[in-house]
């Protein structure tokens, strides 16, 4: 039986009908109505389709039962033809800005399913997602469409969510079923949604600006979590595994738009690579697309090289599992439109580079020097060869450079230590030609494959998984002893973009068997540079120094030489069990440049040098490698950050300015193996000019450097090409000093006319310090150069007086003097141990939480002063922080002083990201050669106190005026992994100047901090050892979910305090400090957002990677309660979700004290004096006794309370005193408490720094004083507590606010927004002196004739309002009227409604399914309010009087909101 209709109409059909009618009011404004008919249907799917004659397995073994989206013709009887390439994917939905997408959906499957878009503007009945959002049953019909039923979804593509200026023409999103994210996805319910700029699509929906467009979904399907369970894990592209994806077709010189989706119900990363091609993504040139499960990217590619090219994810397990396909580029006779013409000057810059590289077998020592500080467990597991382990020495193959084609004289006589295991650096500019003569001096076939440049098939050097042996050419696999020449030119389409660094970081490796070749050691760095980026020597012009850091995971179990290593290094080779988890793990080496532990030598840099870091992740790792730089920040892609995330087989270029003296650490953030193995120390030091010697000595030193530091990329000139060296403006000073500006001033000067000395001087100037690419330097030699490293870097630091104690005020003062500004912000923070309960309020309703949810943890807590006696109680602004420590706020150029007290039972510290600090305020422990004075910050003992001093340089703050604040984090750094899992972490917000008040709060900004983390209690210091997983379980990767809690701010499911106004700017600061596998994709339902400082790029979801601090800006456009979640289904299902509420900006309606809607029985007080009872405390009340008043006695704390009988949003309070016999009584100051249940009371704090906010009251007995409640509060009970008063505490009150569910604003009867012509009636009363017409039925209308009266008084009369379009009506207020002395009002009434002004339906009583009769007024002037639960969804509404007093008379207001 339909809830709103007398006749039995299915709910879904009713809602469909209402929705279709509502659309007609929006067709005029839409660029286009795009209609799709989509069904969810069962399908038997074969991940490995084979020709019938090749199949020998039964159908049940080959196929899996799936639910998929398919597009149909109008009547849902004929499925539309689809591209074979789309596979499991549903049809691609497209819409331009201004369009309306209408999806007619039918469920042919056996499970309730839905359609939910990652980005679109939709109302609650087109969301397609089920959660507790306070909506009615009729609004939840979209959440889960039952089998056999239909539904129509309506999505608006507005300018607010469309692509921004810097975005590509179309942005890529996904749509999917959101009934059960894990099971729905693994069953196959997913498709692509393209949201495009206006005018970017053809009539057929294809993009105008590309020759071709393709959607590829890289996904992992866990069939055991399908609705139709069948154990299997499938690694696929568009649902095709093992290379069975139909070939993607293209023509040479095509411009292709790629829409790439990553999907998995568990955390997953993909490194998408197109062999032999380059792509452009977000205006950056890439060779690998970094993709995470739950997110999508848009990229484009221009192709020129014909052939069949591999498409794959370079994550090792993906390749092994068959996640690949092919791009087939044909010569279709199209002209070359990709090569631009160069000027004569540009042509002269073109160079030929020739390298002679061999593959050689060596014995590699992963840790030639093991510092005493190395973790003993790590050392025993990876570096010792006890327990029949191999240890730290392995036979490997490496790339080595030779001087010529004879391959007899290496460029290095002694292997340079700093270069490590890496092959020589290959560099080239756009249009340069690179020739690599490769000789295989190893014992098995190898090759060279380069990333980041377009190559021909002859120069590819890669064997594909499906290559038959007869197709393996000489270049793909060079046999032992053979020589092959690879030759390629850097094309215009390979050139770094304007936004890119001068040189972008790529790599090369052997690709006969990529996984095993890399595991064997054959890797090297490659730099692709802009036309003006390199000197004739191959040195980058805009960097003082270049430094390579390759974070490589070598899985020696997959090396070609495993058997050799077992025989040589294991004490008992015959007893080795290669499948033993402990043995296997001991052979997986986490390295930086091939070293698996810290080295005793320290990398040296000169103070103020600009270092160009080239960072790469290589190897069998299936995790992100987060690279952390201490004491400094990377400048990468226009953003300062101190953690860069490297995806497998990808690289990043970043600039680091050496501006902080001391020995610092570059290391991987994350697992124990990564942080111990992937690390190196570097020195940022001053070198005294007086030690540099005279001019002759400098020349001698230059000769030494020329000999020792000759780069591996020495150019072997094959053709004489005229080249000019043109310094960039930023290098003019250096160029003038070296006498190199004559080249530009005298164009006739050719390369042959330059002196060798000029080139040597430029080389030396660019490689000051000890660098990885130029070999090691003997200590004795360094003593005779200008670069001699001092054994104690702090000895030359003028800030240090070893004879005096450290004084934090002195440090702060020095910072303040340096920046010529005196603004110091003090914080008092303690580490305390607490019992933390992960269970939400409604734990019994959550099935996925473990039985035990309460654990001992340590948290940061704020105190008011250095006595640490009075905690700073959190207020409404801190309510959402959960487990997070207090927010540390500062402005650019401030100095932060944090006094830290350790009230816990074990050592902790404070370590800050993104800020500038001396070694004595780092809060981390490693071998940094610091004096003892500088090590006291490393670990503060229990009950100890220490003051950390941090400076806020400009790089720590917002990068432009559009960005308000930038987020970082602080945590205990004694053992970061264990400390954070124990709970010790908090946010840092650095804001523009003038944005923080004296209480350290931001001014006029709505901001929230969200910390996404899977807390693993087994990694906490406080977890009982007896409950931990066994060593065997850990070694094989078994993780018990009983002790892990995916949460936001440490609270699964029900984080509180996320409330904001519609259309206000909301700033979200998102943190992720989890390990390498902690990948979260943040989705705000119903809203889109931009990243702070990058407002030119639109986001629908945000991948939040390990060590990421992201600040985003949102302008909520839809009121209501919405879901905030991770798109990683398994984490979402287990609690990484929360609700946020968007309230109307007009949420300041009187709640009913003045009007009488709030009854006398709802108002109470602690007491009253004489006849001044609580029920009289109504704003503007009149009479002799017209307010509440009380005589305050000593030690008494009076209050007055209003029970609103439901939870509402309170946004303001109006107060008034009273006057009796010319005597004024009023409250001067008061505070507010509130409660949801009448038992647990909260004192409103707002922005006040103390425990409560004191509101300014009245200054006389008659004036109304209004106070704003910000942030808004949700409560049922409100109490006002007078603290200061005149004569006696006295109140007349009105509360301002709205309903929690939203959609409760007046629709326009009282204001006149509803026109007179839109109000009609069955009849109206006319007299010779007045007419009681329908349009007079407006609430609170004044005058002698101020209401609607019908001509006759009977039950056939009605008042009708036409709202002009489909509207959600949530409540009504009725009022009577007075004529002469006659009180007229309606005592009872019913409601009818319709959407077509024809078929009227009565509003039914939910309990009886009969027409509901509402109780009306009891007098002619008072208000009575009724709520429609469920709400009415209609255009027309009628009020039908049933009984009345004297005569029918009505004044009304309707409340609700528009549906669209």
Swiss-Prot record:
Gene3D superfamilies xrefs: Cupredoxins - blue copper proteins, Galactose-binding domain-like
Site (Cleavage): 771-772, 817-818
Membrane-crossing segments per the record: none
Name the record gives this protein: Venom prothrombin activator omicarin-C non-catalytic subunit
Disulfide bonds: 170-196, 251-332, 503-529, 672-1031, 965-991, 1147-1298, 1303-1457
Gene Ontology biological-process annotations: venom-mediated blood coagulation
GO cellular component, as recorded: extracellular region; plasma membrane; protein-containing complex
Pfam families for the chain: Cu-oxidase_3 (PF07732), F5_F8_type_C (PF00754)
Main localization of the protein described in the UniProt heading: secreted
SUPFAM superfamilies: Cupredoxins, Galactose-binding domain-like
GO MF assignments: copper ion binding; peptidase activator activity; signaling receptor activity; toxin activity
Organism: Oxyuranus microlepidotus
Annotated binding of Ca(2+) 2, by residue: 919, 934, 937-938
UniProt region (B), positions on chain: 693-817
Propiece span(s): 772-817
Compartment(s): Secreted
Chain sites annotated for binding Ca(2+) 1: 124, 139, 142-143
F5/8 type A domain segment(s): 32-330, 350-685, 823-1143
